[in-house]
Amino acid sequence: MENEEKNKIKSQELTQRIGKNGDRILRENLDDIGLANEINHEVIDLINRLRVYGVDIKKVFSECGRDSTLKTEIDRNQAMNIVSRFFYKFGIDVSKLLEEGKYNNESGQTVYLSFNKEVKRNETTSPTFVGEDVHAYAKETGTLTDVYSLVHEISHTLYVQNQFGEARMILGEVIPQCMERMLDSYLVELAERKENDVDIGTLKKDITKRKISTAIDRFRLTSRIAKGEYKFASEKAELSRYMLAQIYATQLMESDKSVRKQRIFEFIEALKSNDIQKANDAFDMKIGKEHTKERARYVSNSIWNLQKDVLTFQGNEVSKEKRDETTRTISEEENELEI
C-alpha cells in the first residue's frame, strides 16, 4: 500500500509538471487562444456562407452531431476483420488484440481492448510511466461507427509506450484522427472491389458524415477556447488537443499519398520520444505563432474541407445554381491559398 501511495504521488507530480510546461508551450509557442479565435471567426463566416448557399445548417448539425449513427450495417466480425486488415497495410498486426482483447506490444507493455455493447464511451487510458498497462474501450453498435471507433482507440495505443510528456499532452489526438482519414479511402477501396457487401452510395455518405461530425466536434471545442469556456489550464489543453488534431489531419491529407504512411510513422516516433519539433517536421508543419501565413493556410484548408463535405452531404438539397456559385467561390479561395 505504501508503494502504491508513493507511485500515485509521483504520477501526480509528473502530470502536474508536464501540465504546466505543456500549457506554457501552448501559450507562448503556439498561442492556442489566438489560433482558436482565428478558427472560430472562420467557422462563423462559413456558417453564414453556407446559409446563403441554401444549406440547412440546423439539419446538418442534427444529422451529423456527435452521437449520430452511421447507416451502413457492419457486424462484429466484419468490423474486426476490416480493422485488422487496415492496420496490416501499415505493417501493424492487431489481430491478437482484436481476437483476444489483449496483447503485449514491442515494449512489453500490455494493451487491453474492450469492444462490446456494454462500453459506455470510447476512450483509451494514457499511462504515466513506462510499462504501465493500456486499456482501450470501443462501444459496439453494429454499424460502420464500430470500425472508426476501433481504429481511433487502437491508434492511441501505438505511441504510449514511454513516459507521459508534453508532446503526447498537446498532440495526442493527431494520430487517431489521421488514421480515421486514412481509413476513409480504404473503406471505399474495399467496397469498389466488392470485398464487403455494402451499398457504396450509403457508405460514401456515411464517410462524409463521419468527417463532418468530427470537424463539428473539433470546432465546437475550439469555440470554447475562444470564448474562455474553461476553468483550468488543463481543461484548455484538452480542448487544444482536439483543435490541433483537426488541423494536423487536414495537413496530412493535403500531402501526397505516397508519403502519408511514412509521415504517420515519423509522427508516432516523435510522440514516443516527446519531441514536438520532430512531430511538426514529420508533417511539414509550421504552426508556431510566428508563422502567421502558414497558420492562416492551415485554418483555411480545414474550413475549406468542411465546406466541401457539407455541400457534398447536402448536395441533393442545394440548388444547382447555388452549388455552381459555391464551386466558383471555393475555386477562388483555393487559388488564393496557392498564391
Residue ranges and their predicted role:
Residues 54-61, 96-103, 165-173, 189-203, ...:
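Short, glycine/acidic-rich hinge or "gate" loops at secondary-structure transitions
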Residues 171-185, 245-246:
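An active-site-proximal "capping" alpha-helix that borders the catalytic cofactor pocket
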